[in-house]
């Protein structure tokens, strides 16, 4: 308001206008501070991935598997459901990861195979969370009472929820990601689109591995691509089924993030396989007294190009030489359980890993 306009106002109105103009800068500062406070309050207590990023949670289910992927558009895939019982502990931890990611339902749940530490949590999960579809490799193939029981419990739990049987070469529709099934029911993909098979020099010294008759070698495994970022999760695939993926030619190529096969058991993680995929970072979803075998740990630790090997638990049945440094372990011996790793990936291939126990994040720049 100009001075000549002020003189046209009645005296009382003119005094109010002058006071308002004198205090206007302070009012503007107050509004700015309020806006900043509201913005901070809205995000306090949440660590959702920034827009345009892929989030991957390696949830602590005590040596089982539950891995949550959330796309930039909040589409979701849960790989496996952890154990049954324990007062719904594993379903609680899955729900906590979902809350952190800002989602309330699961679009897809992939069951890699029908062992209790992977499929056992399904009944608890469906009681709490809406699931769009379940995916698995088909009928249980293992001749054991416990696995037959767990498979039957899974089929009963999913009820009328859509179920899709996946085969090598199938894709899982997650907008923004390319999610391809590499292995399922003992079969493997013949070629990965966009990957040129290369001869694998590590095959020459790899022993022959016998095939076991459990559900493990029938694991449904996936390769997830988000721009240049590549994540590999093959469930509990064992050595005899790892080798055809990389020998004589490497069909997979290199990966940025490797969820260590079979929780780090030495029945899996053959040297020719691990060295061929050349992981930049590996996460071992072992338990305190489950897996984390010294031989498997050493193979992954020594793989060419590896920068860090994270562990969900200290492997208490191993020795200090075959455990990662404490900052790379989510749950330490003698400490509280339930801590997890959260990976946030960008389409340019860069990513970070956050240890929820420490709150510390390590960045892995584009290379």
For each feature predicted by the language model, list its residue ranges.
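N-terminal secretory signal peptides that target proteins for export/translocation
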Residues: 1-24
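Intrinsically disordered, low-complexity regulatory regions of eukaryotic regulatory proteins
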Residues: 2-3, 30, 324
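Compositionally biased, intrinsically disordered low-complexity regions
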Residues: 7, 11-12, 33-35, 135, ...
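Alpha-helical transmembrane segments of integral membrane proteins
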Residues: 23-26, 171
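Bacterial N-terminal signal peptides
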Residues: 26-41
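Non-globular, low-confidence helical/coil segments that flank catalytic cores
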Residues: 44-367
